[in-house]
Curated annotation (Swiss-Prot):
The modification Phosphoserine is found at residues 12, 69, 306. Acetylated at Lys-131 by EP300; increases interaction with EP300 and stimulates ALX1 transcriptional activity. Residues 192-326 are annotated as: Transactivation domain. This is ALX homeobox protein 1. It comes from Rattus norvegicus (Rat). InterPro entries: HD (IPR001356), Homeobox_CS (IPR017970), Homeodomain-like_sf (IPR009057), OAR_dom (IPR003654), Paired_Homeobox_TFs (IPR050649). The OAR motif may negatively regulate DNA-binding and therefore transcriptional activity. It is found in the C-terminal transactivation domain that stimulates transcription. Changing residue 131 to R: Loss of EP300-mediated transcriptional coactivation. Binds DNA as a homodimer; required for transcriptional activation. Interacts (via homeobox domain) with EP300; acetylates ALX1 and stimulates its transcriptional activity. One of its GO terms (molecular function) is sequence-specific DNA binding. The gene is Alx1.
Length: 326
C-alpha cells in the first residue's frame, strides 16, 4: 500500500473495490496490465476521441530510440509511438527507405562538363549581345563642309552651336561633339609634326654640312693625291685661316700617307663637329712635287684638298693649345 502511494500520485486513496488495489502478497504484473488496458479518460471524453480519431490499437512494445543516423536505421520515429499498421508510420518508413537509397546510390542528374561549357557560352553570348554596339558614322561632303566651317571659327563650340550645327547637318548633337573631339586630336597631331619639321629645317640651315667631304670620296682623293710614290711632300703656300686672323701660320708640309692618315682625319672631323668651312677658304695654291708631278686643278679637287689641309692644321693647332695650357 505504501509502495503504490509513493510511485503513483492518486487523487484519492485506493479502495478495495478499485483495480489498483493490491493486497498483501499481490503481484505487480496485474497492476501493470490494468494500467495498459485503462483509457484514462472519462466516458464522455472517450467517446469524442473515438469518434474523431478512431480506436487506438494496443502498443505491443515500447519505442526503441536509436542514436544512429536516420539514414542508416529506419526504425527511428523521434518520440512518436510506433504502432503497426498506422498510415503515418508507413509514410515515415517509406521516407526513411528513400533516404537510404539516396545515400547508397551515386549522384545522378548532375550536368556534364560539355553541358556546363554550352551553358557558359550561352551566358557569354547573352552578355555580349546586351552590350551597346558602336556604329561608325559616315559623313557626307556637305556635312563635312559645314563642320569644317565651324571648326575654322572655333575649336570648342558650345552646346547651342552644336545643336544648330546638328540641325543643319541632320546629325545628333552627340555625333557632332564626337566629331569635334576627333578633329581637335587630328589638329594637335599635325601641329606637333609641323613643329618637328620646322626644327629640322632650322637646324639644317644653321649647320651647313654640304661642304664637308663624304666617305665615298676618300678612294678618289687617295688615288689623285698619293698616286705618285715620292719622297718629298707638297707645301701649302697660302694662308688658309679665317679671314679675321691677324697672322698666318708657317707653311705646312705633308708627306704621302697611307690609309691610316684618313682614319685620323675622320677622327678629327668627328672631334670638331659640323663647322661651316666657307670662311676658312681663301685663294690657295698647291705646288707640285719634286719629281714634276702636279696636282689637278679642278675646283672640286681643290676644295676637297683644302678642306683636308685646313682640318689637319686645326688639329695641330688644337694639340698645341692643349699642350701649352698644360
Amino acid at each position: 500500500m505504501e509502495f503504490l502511494s509513493e510511485k503513483f500520485a492518486l487523487k484519492s486513496p485506493p479502495s478495495k473495490n478499485s483495480d489498483f488495489y493490491m493486497g498483501t502478497g499481490g503481484a505487480l504484473e496485474h497492476v501493470m496490465e490494468t494500467l495498459d488496458n485503462e483509457s484514462f479518460y472519462g466516458k464522455a471524453t472517450a467517446g469524442k476521441c473515438v469518434q474523431a480519431f478512431g480506436p487506438l490499437p494496443r502498443a505491443e512494445h515500447h519505442v526503441r530510440l536509436d542514436r544512429t543516423s536516420p539514414c542508416q536505421d529506419s526504425s527511428v520515429n523521434y518520440g512518436i509511438t510506433k504502432v503497426e499498421g498506422q498510415p503515418l508510420h508507413t509514410e515515415l518508413n517509406r521516407a526513411m527507405d528513400g533516404c537510404n537509397n539516396l545515400r547508397m546510390s551515386p549522384v545522378k542528374g548532375m550536368p556534364e562538363k560539355s553541358e556546363l561549357d554550352e551553358l557558359g557560352d550561352k551566358c557569354d553570348s547573352n552578355v555580349s549581345s546586351s552590350k551597346k554596339r558602336r556604329h561608325r558614322t559616315t559623313f557626307t561632303s556637305l556635312q563635312l563642309e559645314e563642320l569644317e566651317k565651324v571648326f575654322q571659327k572655333t575649336h570648342y563650340p558650345d552646346v547651342y552651336v552644336r545643336e544648330q550645327l546638328a540641325l543643319r547637318t541632320e546629325l545628333t548633337e552627340a555625333r557632332v561633339q564626337v566629331w569635334f573631339q576627333n578633329r581637335r586630336a587630328k589638329w594637335r597631331k599635325r601641329e606637333r609634326y609641323g613643329q618637328i619639321q620646322q626644327a629640322k629645317s632650322h637646324f639644317a640651315a644653321t649647320y651647313d654640312i654640304s661642304v664637308l667631304p663624304r666617305t665615298d670620296s676618300y678612294p678618289q682623293i687617295q688615288n689623285n693625291l698619293w698616286a705618285g710614290n715620292t719622297s718629298g711632300g707638297s707645301v701649302v703656300t697660302s694662308c688658309m685661316l679665317p679671314r679675321d686672323a691677324s697672322s698666318c701660320m708657317t707653311p705646312y708640309s705633308h708627306s704621302p700617307r697611307t690609309d691610316s692618315s684618313y682614319t685620323g682625319f675622320s677622327n678629327h672631323q668627328n672631334q670638331f663637329g659640323h663647322v661651316p668651312l666657307n670662311n676658312f677658304f681663301t685663294d690657295s695654291l698647291l705646288t707640285g712635287t719634286t719629281n714634276g708631278h702636279a696636282f689637278e686643278t679642278k675646283p672640286e679637287f681643290e676644295r676637297r684638298s683644302s678642306s683636308i689641309a685646313v682640318l689637319r692644321m686645326k688639329a695641330k693647332e688644337h694639340t698645341a693649345n692643349i699642350s701649352w695650357a698644360m
